[in-house]
UniProtKB/Swiss-Prot annotation:
Superkingdom classification of source: Bacteria
Protein name as annotated: Mannitol-1-phosphate 5-dehydrogenase
InterPro entries: 6-PGluconate_DH-like_C_sf, 6PGD_dom2, Mannitol_1_phos_5_DH, Mannitol_DH, Mannitol_DH_C, Mannitol_DH_N, NAD(P)-bd_dom_sf
Gene Ontology molecular functions: mannitol-1-phosphate 5-dehydrogenase activity
Species annotation: Buchnera aphidicola subsp. Baizongia pistaciae (strain Bp)
Gene: mtlD
SUPFAM superfamilies to which the protein is assigned, alphabetical: 6-phosphogluconate dehydrogenase C-terminal domain-like, NAD(P)-binding Rossmann-fold domains
E.C. no: 1.1.1.17
HAMAP family: Mannitol_dehydrog
NCBIfam families for this protein: PRK02318.1-2, PRK02318.2-2
Residues binding NAD(+): A3, L4, H5, F6, G7, A8, G9, N10, I11, G12, R13, G14
Keyword Cell membrane part of the UniProt annotation: no
GO biological process: mannitol catabolic process
Length: 390
């Protein structure tokens, strides 16, 4: 069995790729970074350091190869693929539409009727379904029957904290990564048109929407708020931030607020189950050996402030269900304070706030009604955070 993984980044190398190899697939990474592609093909292996508060061990991933996405012979080289997984990031996912449209054409023209499963592993709601819709818009109608019959687009939720390992002193790309032991990969069991791939660690569910928002509203929400608050104080890593009692209380409070939304919205998680889930995530954040940079977690703040992302989406639902949201508002205010001259989105956000104000940003970027009282409340927290430490 052959598998491709698009995106030879942290999640690809540290989570999805190793599971595919462990499950018996021949794995090829596809990436738009020629240097990473060359490094993978040169070494054909890399190390994963698994760390916890009382353990650390190294595993070596072997027999890996990679191909540059703009290789002129890529469609020939990846023929007869059985499984494609994707973790390229929110901003890059749409760039794959043209690639997959051409791949489908190539499969038809070469009489390739091997069933293909495409699984999106992104922090985007129903990412694979959206990808399929966009491909169909581009793909001529005469090819739609082939797509619908032979290709499964499967949505999933992935959860594992993966960090780049320490840089080495050579000019070579350091492929090694550092990961936590915890992992979760849940896929929508209703979207497979043919036999499900036998992948170790994959969980099949028909409640994917609930699991997606559980992860987004809890891990991603808490992660982001811890990062933005930590940066205000001057911390560097997630574990430093979450060990600060004041930050911990706000993050824990925000997670409980978003948790009340999930319990009310889905009637699927119990209070005790979700409390344990929150506490498990907080313990993961406290892993002092997982040096997860606050700037890495906080990067691309405009994306994180969109209405369907980790900060605004749970806030909107607290309004809908008339639930508490003070800690979520504090987290959003901290995100608005984010400054990083190397982050294009952070610079845009800063300029928008200076020139247009908070109300404009939350209306334009977050699609919040400018008349909402919470905008004034977020503005108050923002002004406090900008003047003094928390």
């Amino acid at each position: 069995m052959n598998a491709l993984h698009f995106g030879a980044g942290n999640i690809g190398r540290g989570f999805i790729g190793p599971l595919l190899l462990k499950s018996g697939f021949n794995l090829t990474f596809v990436d738009n970074n020629q240097a990473i592609v060359d490094a993978i093909n040169r070494h054909q292996k890399y190390d994963i350091t698994v760390v916890g508060n009382n353990f650390s061990y190294i595993t070596t991933v072997k027999k890996v190869k990679a191909i540059y996405i703009n290789d002129p012979n890529i469609y020939f080289k990846i023929a007869k693929i059985n499984v494609i997984t994707i973790s390229v990031g929110v901003h890059a996912i749409n760039s794959l539409v043209v690639f997959f449209e051409k791949l489908i054409r190539y499969k038809i023209e070469t009489n390739d009727f091997v069933f293909l499963t495409i699984i999106a592993c992104e922090n985007v709601f129903r990412c694979a379904s959206k990808l399929k819709e966009n491909i169909k818009i581009l793909l001529p109608g005469i090819y739609h029957k082939y797509l619908d019959k032979n290709i499964s687009f499967v949505d999933s939720v992935v959860d594992k904290i993966v960090c780049p390992n320490d840089k080495n002193n050579s000019d070579d790309i350091n492929l090694s990564v550092k990961v936590e032991k915890f992992s979760e990969w849940i896929v929508d069991c209703t979207q497979f048109k043919h036999d499900r791939p036998n992948i170790i660690g994959m969980i099949y569910s028909n409640h994917l929407d609930a699991f997606f928002e559980r992860k987004l509203f809890t891990l991603n929400t808490g992660h982001a708020i811890a990062a933005y608050l930590g940066l205000l104080i001057g911390y560097k890593n997630i574990y430093q931030a979450i060990l600060d009692p004041l930050i911990f209380n706000i993050v824990y409070g925000a997670m409980k607020e978003s948790g009340m939304v999930l319990i009310r919205k889905y009637n699927f998680f119990t209070d005790s189950e979700h409390k344990n889930y929150i506490l498990k995530i907080l313990s993961r954040f406290k892993n002092i050996y997982l040096t997860d940079s606050l700037k890495r977690v906080g990067r691309n703040p405009l994306q994180k402030l969109k209405k369907d992302d980790r900060l605004i989406s749970p806030l909107i639902d607290t309004i809908k269900y008339n639930l508490p949201n003070a800690n979520l508002m504090k987290g959003i205010a901290a995100a608005l304070c984010y400054i990083d001259e190397k982050d294009i989105e952070a610079k845009k956000l800063r300029n928008m706030i200076i020139n247009k104000g908070i109300k404009y940003v939350l209306s334009k970027i977050s699609s919040l009604d400018s008349s909402l009282l919470i905008i004034s409340e977020i503005s108050i927290y923002f002004n406090i955070f900008m003047k003094v430490n928390i």
